[in-house]
Amino acid sequence: MVKFTKKDKRKNKKLMPERNENYMNNIKKLCGFCINEWHLTTMILPYISKEIENNYKMITILENSIEENIKTLIKKLNLKNEEDILEINWKQSVAQKYTEVGSKLNIIAKSDEKYIILVNGRKNFIDVVNKHIDKWLKKNTKVKQEIKIINCYEITDFNYNI
């Protein structure tokens, strides 16, 4: 018979580091799928417009730029917050190193505003970015505002690894 205990027999040794009791309660992870950049643009634009009206700020980490698609679609739509949407960086992001992702996320730590982090690309790209985001969140446990992380996978390979 095996007995599982939480007690550590070494003196003054904590099993888990102390954290803010609200740690990760303010983080929501969402998932979506798109076929290409145009599909992403038409899918995400109404959602982003609504969330900007709800006082969310936006950070994008994109494998491919969708800036031209956003500009083209905004010209054809009548949105209240066109300027706010165009101010978002819709260009391709370099996200292979933690410092590249961390520098984008440091804006959150300096602010009290709610944020949406949009991550778009193929599975490998999103996996790397999410590791960097998780590492950043563990280092910045004092961040208390609401953060939504939207992972939007680009489905270019149709296989069972999704």
Regions found by a protein language model. Name each.
Residues 2-162:
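Non-catalytic regulatory/interaction regions at protein termini and inter-domain linkers
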